[in-house]
Each structure stands twice: as C-alpha cells, then as structure tokens.
Amino acid sequence: MTEEPRPRAPITESAVLAWLETTAAAVEAGEVSAQELIDLLGELRRASAACADASDWLLLAAREGGASLRQIAPVFGKGYVRAPAARLEKLHRQAQTSGQWLAILRHKQTA
C-alpha cells in the first residue's frame, strides 16, 4: 500500500530566488522591457497576497488541528507566541474557522 503524498506548498523560497536570479540576468541583458517588469510586478503582488491568504488559512487549520501557539510561533520568526496570537486575533474578526476563511477567499475570487 502506498502512502498519499503529503501536501506541499505550491511555491518555495528557493524557487522564488532561482526565478529572481534568472529574471535579474535577463533584465541586466536588456531582454525585459519596463512594461514586462510592471506586468511581472503586478502578477507577483497578486501571488504574494494569495500566499498570505493561504498562510492565514493554514494558521487557522493548524489551530483547529490542535497545534498550540508555542508550536506555531517558530514559523513566524523569533519564536514569540505574540505574532501568531495577534494574527489569529485579527483573523477572528473575519472568520472563526478555516472553512469560513476559505469561503471568504472563494467569494473574494468571484467578486
């Protein structure tokens, strides 16, 4: 019996840095126009917002799954529980569960 593959993030830090190196080289070589850079900027900013939304969903889902703030804190940086606690407090003004947050994201996408 084979195990189901574990969920993975759709984008990684190393993939972004590799893309940045390639893009920077193309820009330095004069192969990318200003308009193309502006288009990429817009695309990257939208993707960044989508990553932030996904991060918020994962935070809610982890808490629902029983993760403590102390367990979650290291991914926020210095290991302080204040950061995820503050983010949860802000999220809870809009959604109490990961399901509610996903519904908000779906609505936002169709609006």
Where are these regions (language model features)?
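The alpha-helix within a helix-turn-helix
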Residues: I72-P74
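Short, amphipathic alpha-helical "recognition" segments used to contact nucleic acids or chromatin
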Residues: S48-G66
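Short, basic interhelical loop/turn and adjoining N-cap
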Residues: L37-L40, F76-R87
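Short, Lys/Arg-enriched N-terminal segment that forms or immediately precedes the first helix
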Residues: V32-A47
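Short, Lys/Arg-rich amphipathic alpha-helical interaction segments
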Residues: V81-A111
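General nucleic-acid-binding
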Residues: M1-Q35
